[in-house]
UniProtKB/Swiss-Prot annotation:
The keyword Chaperone does not apply. Pfam families: Phospholip_A2_1. Belongs to the phospholipase A2 family. Group I subfamily. D49 sub-subfamily. One of its GO terms (molecular function) is toxin activity. The keyword Calcium applies. Ca(2+) binds at Y27, G29, G31, D48. It catalyses: a 1,2-diacyl-sn-glycero-3-phosphocholine + H2O = a 1-acyl-sn-glycero-3-phosphocholine + a fatty acid + H(+). Its cofactor is Ca(2+). The active site is at H47, D92. SUPFAM superfamilies: Phospholipase A2, PLA2. Expressed by the venom gland. It comes from Naja pallida (Red spitting cobra). It comes from the Eukaryota. This is Basic phospholipase A2 nigexine.
Length: 118
């Protein structure tokens, strides 16, 4: 769920508050439209697509609880998660790891969505 995703982000990117990722680019934090503006925004587009795929499986990705572990910046989804929990955990894990590897460009935070995301 979104609370667990926030905690996963904190695991992989402890130096930056989670909410910095909630209004970034064209895909981080809102529906998503247009071409991703950078690598971090592309991480969010992939995450959105992953949630969409989980939804098509009959899952509720924003609310599905799952089990995972964070150890020294490394995330692991619990192998005993059910079908939906496993799918959503994997979406969040991949995104949190992607965030950790992508540069954060301050100018791409809180952009003019209507102008830049067509």
């Amino acid at each position: 769920n979104l609370y667990q995703f926030k905690n996963m982000i904190h695991c992989t990117v402890p130096s930056r508050p989670w909410w910095h990722f909630a209004d970034y680019g064209c895909y981080c934090g809102r529906g998503g439209k247009g071409t991703p503006i950078d690598d971090l925004d592309r991480c969010c587009q992939v995450h959105d697509n992953c949630y969409e795929k989980a939804g098509k499986m009959g899952c509720w990705p924003y609310f599905t609880l799952y089990k995972y572990k964070c150890s020294k910046g490394t995330l692991t989804c619990n192998g005993r998660n059910g079908k939906c929990a496993a799918a959503v955990c994997n979406c969040d894990l991949v995104a949190a790891n992607c965030f950790a590897g992508a540069p954060y460009i301050n100018a791409n935070y809180n952009i003019d969505f209507k102008k830049r995301c067509q």
